[in-house]
């Protein structure tokens, strides 16, 4: 769907699998919840096929995760901010962008500074909206030059989530680093942090303990339950998967996340915002943006960010940052893919002649 620009509009995974055998349907329900954070009836078929194709079918090595050595702040955000300061840039915390206004020399960005309780603005020749879909929609609907068009655009849904971490005074028997839950569980996927992140690895070496991070992707009504209920059910799910850990828990925390987790789908051409928007000098990036790359999630956010930065560099006649192409499919998968593409092209040509 991403390569061919096929939105499969109005179709959801639930429509596709409703008549499948129960066991096979259960597998796809688990995949939908764990990788696109939604139940099949809420998962756009285009997004699911895009995920399945790139992350499971074309290359076996795509099944393996790559992990940051530390938390996201230490590994990614703090180095980026440091580099920004090093280059003369600045950040403003506690501020909410309210709208944009087009002026002769660029875009005036308006925001509310909650710490000073003041409205402020700044003029920029180019602007990149590096925000989630729902906040991009709010900003563009509130901006005079973009509001009319924004009302008719395709905006992917975003879901609230919860992250739970549990600490144990012993390790699980299974030598695994990550996996998914399926069946009658509230949890969706898990990661054993003492096998992945430096701080937890050091703690494990010192204590012999283990720590797991589990994600809860909804439904929204589940996430509204009291924290004590969510923690109790999460511990029960982990104990069910790793019974040797029962009665060995020593600490637990839960974090609720705002509804910014994208349920990706491919919107109709001209209605799904791309990196280059219909408005001059205004660009978008994020995991929800339409772009030819087959990658999703954090990878998509990074790729579209580089593409948006390149658009600004182009406007200033500066060298571009190279974008790495996705790895090619393995031989058998590539052969099947070429056959399918050839067949679809032939079918479209036949339909056009009728």
Cite the ranges covered by each PLM segment.
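Conserved flavin/dinucleotide-binding core of flavoenzymes
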Residues: 173-354
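Mid-domain catalytic core of redox enzymes
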Residues: 93-223, 228, 232, 236-242
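Rossmann-like flavin
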Residues: 1-53
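Residues forming the flavin
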Residues: 69, 75-82, 96-98, 113, ...
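Generic structural signal for well-ordered, non-membrane alpha-helical segments
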Residues: 6, 10, 25, 69, ...
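Helical element adjacent to the flavin cofactor pocket in flavoenzyme catalytic cores
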Residues: 51-126
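Active-site rim elements
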Residues: 2-4, 63-69, 151-152, 219-225, ...
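Amphipathic alpha-helical segments that form well-ordered structural scaffolds
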Residues: 12-16, 31, 75-83, 233-240, ...
